[in-house]
């Protein structure tokens, strides 16, 4: 039985849930990969993360020119500041001594939506060459020149949020770019030869679905190494702190659409998604959508996977590691 993402995108909630419950959407993956990245303490009866193994560093400290309504630099405050190449190298060396095996390099954006990566390329190359750490990089809008430089420096994978609505880009992201710029960024990443993992954000437009299917269609013109679905999560102290986040079934529509559109591409439910009671539903619906991995899975979701006789593994990697893990487990 084959399914069209557009067709079930329009189905009623009950029809959609019935479809997921049949298990016919896509074959069950050989192994479910559960991730507990080091930027947040995570503990279940099955696994607990270690805070130094795969931390997130901000190349701009808490600075960001955009002041996006959903973040307002609050997310940057949770990262270790490494706002000069020298600081990046020094902190990477210390982390290596503490048992770190990988880094996620992130940061705030410039007015054009890019992250100022170019000045850090020599430091990244040194970290790869001398410390042999896995390095993932959030890119934002990116040029071919910078993408090639990251590839030559040895970056393992580039992570990029793809927004499929010009209105969302402008109203929420405070950005004067369009979906075409995200398309061009994916083209640059693919041309450079970098492994790249697009992220689709569910409910970024005031908690409502808008442009997520279009984002997947943009990605479909390329050959991503993996896809990660994340969801708007209200952050205390921001303009959107009181916005109701997307419901589990809305997040599931996007993960299911991604699975149907990319049947052979590793797919994960990422770390950013609503907390609380809805998290359990979100996680279990993701498993029913045949994702290959979940970051910070709820205890109940792990039990569900166990009851369904999934094989599963745990790791402190960033969940973008699914681009390798899912392929190796086949």
What are the residue ranges of the model-derived segments?
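Glycine-enriched alpha-helix->loop->beta-strand junction motifs that scaffold or abut catalytic
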Residues: 151-158, 193, 221-225, 285-293, ...
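Conserved Radical SAM active-site core
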Residues: 46-55, 73-172, 176-196, 204-214, ...
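Short beta->alpha connector loops
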Residues: 40, 139-143, 273-277, 297-300
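Conserved, mostly hydrophobic/aromatic
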Residues: 68, 105, 258, 286
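Flexible, acidic/Gly-rich N-terminal and inter-domain linker regions that tether
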Residues: 1-62, 66, 329
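Radical SAM enzyme core and accessory elements
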Residues: 1-22, 279-284, 288-330
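Short acidic, glycine/proline-enriched helix-loop-strand junctions
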Residues: 113-115, 131-133, 176-181, 237-251, ...
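Conserved C-terminal portion of the radical SAM core fold
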Residues: 180-240, 250-270, 297-298
